[in-house]
């Protein structure tokens, strides 16, 4: 019983994650070569897809960022039970963009929340770094 209580306690803690490297982004086959003279770059805190009206609507977020060639997103939810995909993956599918979800912490041993990058162009290498060590809900 004590061991089960220990596992539940550890699982419910928020854990920060280490950096990683990679060579491709999810759905990179959908990217296109940059041929223009202008590039639209955006950043958006999606607040887990909750708008100022309190409604959660990820498709509304997709409409807002649809004109960006590259967009960085903050407060992106990780995979949900049942779907197995994070919000960045869904946005990438709908907008036909390569997507990378970078969880900043785990909860119940799974990626919980983090940042994301969506890109219309091929990415040959990526790296995410933990900017500072952090624990707890304050980060």
Protein language model regions, located:
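N-terminal G-site of the GST-like fold
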Residues: 56-58
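Enzyme catalytic cores with a strong preference for nitrogen-chemistry domains
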Residues: 2-5, 41
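Structured beta-strand-rich core segments of catalytic domains in phosphoester-bond hydrolases
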Residues: 5, 9-34, 50-54, 75-139
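Active-site beta-strand/loop signature of hydrolases that rely on acidic residues for catalysis
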Residues: 39-46, 60-84, 118
């Amino acid at each position: 019983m004590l061991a089960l209580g220990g596992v539940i306690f550890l699982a419910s803690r928020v854990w920060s994650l280490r950096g990683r490297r990679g060579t491709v982004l999810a759905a990179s086959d959908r990217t296109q070569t940059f041929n223009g003279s202008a590039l639209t770059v955006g950043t958006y805190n999606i607040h887990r897809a909750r708008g100022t009206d309190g409604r959660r609507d990820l498709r509304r977020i997709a409409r807002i960022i649809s004109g960006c060639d590259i967009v960085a997103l903050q407060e992106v939810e990780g995979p949900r039970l049942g779907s197995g995909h994070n919000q960045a993956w869904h946005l990438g599918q709908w907008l036909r963009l390569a997507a990378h979800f970078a969880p900043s912490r785990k909860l119940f041993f799974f990626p919980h929340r983090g940042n994301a990058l969506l890109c219309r162009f091929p990415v040959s290498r990526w790296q995410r770094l933990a900017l500072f060590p952090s624990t707890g809900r304050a980060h």
